[in-house]
């Protein structure tokens, strides 16, 4: 019943604080208009225990029945964002509240904004809850594993319709300021319920927002107000620490700026951060070293599957000075014995994935050494997950994975369910096209378990997936965690 569902949605807005009580009638009228409805009756309905997902589902069903939208996930997602926007304050009101709360403390401001980003359904809590998450203990610490199920699968109708639609270059990408309030298209998400907090980084306008897919607590994105490409240089380090000074309870890192070792969006300058301590941040330094001329910065090699130098200092400037020196040295560094080539045929290979944070009184910067060289044996990258691990993960190892969180493809959920059944019943895994790619891996680990039962098979699979992710990270490390690898790492440190 339309009136019933509208009343519930408005009440949800009031309960969460995104809609003031004084705007009840105004908001009701905005919603009626979206349903082409001239009438309204204030009906009696149960306003206790309101569940947003259920209210929206009812309203979307009504919109589809009335022919206002096509009944497919793409169109439903565009329309429910429109519905939520009717409950929302204007951007300037949210910005004003944010900075008022910031005067109390940076945490108070981000707590408010994170809750708002969820209450507005920009972060769809009920979808995030579907993600599968677990942890795996390794020699490097406890790694986080997630199978990402919150990104909606594209439905075939929407793909076909998007193919026929006129192509648009507005907004230029999903990280542009122009997304705020944008109604979206089948090939570009609706962002009408999205609100960005403008901040100043290096005297330039930047935006601060949360990721709608929240891979970890308070997963935020900090992005340039201009659509300019990613670049790792001194300026990038300065930008990271400008943000850390604003929000010292958050870390902030950047993807590398080269293909294969970079993230999925290299075309728009941006960083990712949040209020979470990854395994990498907990990893100890295995040996300290001092770089001549930079004696006031503590430096060391981190015990981590990727090759990481950690810098610490009470002051930001000396930290950035040394980071720039390490970056420039690494960019031009070749060590043939360790298969590190700065460039081949004029194509550069060496770059860095940096992560900045504040630890007590110290500013800290982790510099992850990356190289994107390819060979015939490893066409996707020598320091990239090798082919035998592609059944679990073949995508780029970006910032989030570097820090110790696996973001694994949604296909794995169904494949793991099938594998459980095949392992328990002793069926031939190779006979099923969907899971045949996992057969060698299962053959490898099965002998390590004396008994696999319905009670422990899921836990065993989760642990084995975690071990594969650990191997993935080791593949991405330019210096392996063995005697030979450490010797080669020492050679690089020696030239600093």
Q: What are these model-derived regions, one by one?
A:
Residues 1-222, 226-229, 303-305, 319-323, ...:
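Active-site microenvironments that recognize anionic phosphate/pyrophosphate groups
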Residues 259-267, 345-351:
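Beta-rich nucleic-acid/ligand-interaction surfaces
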Residues 244, 248-264, 273-325, 331-334:
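Catalytic or ion-translocation cores adjacent to nucleophile or general acid/base/metal-coordination motifs
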Residues 192-197, 227-252:
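Helical scaffold of the NTase/Pol beta-like nucleotidyltransferase catalytic core
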Residues 206-211, 236, 240-244, 290-297:
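Structured alpha-helical segments in the cores of large, soluble enzyme domains
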